[in-house]
Amino acid sequence: FFYFFLNFYFIFGDYMVRKNQEWPDEGELIIGTVYKVLNYGAFAKLEEYHGKEAFIHISEVSSGWVKNIRDHVRENQKIVCRVLRVNPKKGHVDASLKRIREDQRTKKIQHWKIEQKAEKFLELSAKSLDKSLNDAYEEVGYELMDIFGDVYGAFETAADDGAKSLTDEGISQEWADAITEIA
């Protein structure tokens, strides 16, 4: 169990993939980094939602009895968890580690890896236009998410169908050419 998460941490490092919304939805799978472990639960910074954090109560750490929470989660550990409740007014996100099947965890990790690649591709596209990654997200990244579902989908479409497929969706010719060149 610990070995899995240790590998997960070294694979992903501290690279952040962005989401187009401010708060996660209830039931959504999220990726976080545990930064504080207490006797009654753990706090994790959400990787996809900049500046947001989630609380995992000790009763949501494992389906079995938890004698010592540190046997299940450690600081700086990357975790995949399910959102139970979101309260934007209080700034709270409650999450669960135990309400996820292994296949869901694996699928989320694979999607995370793909989106990290896509973000790197977007960064390379931005550099070819002498722009920053933040500029890329503001100008085209969030729009690509709305149109294609995620940034990687836009790069797949550009690789398969060329820059015209992006311009037909309303992406500027400048960005369409840069994305197609990288794809």
Language-model features and meaning:
Residues Y3, F8-A183:
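Single-stranded RNA-binding regions, centering on S1/OB-family and related RNA-binding modules
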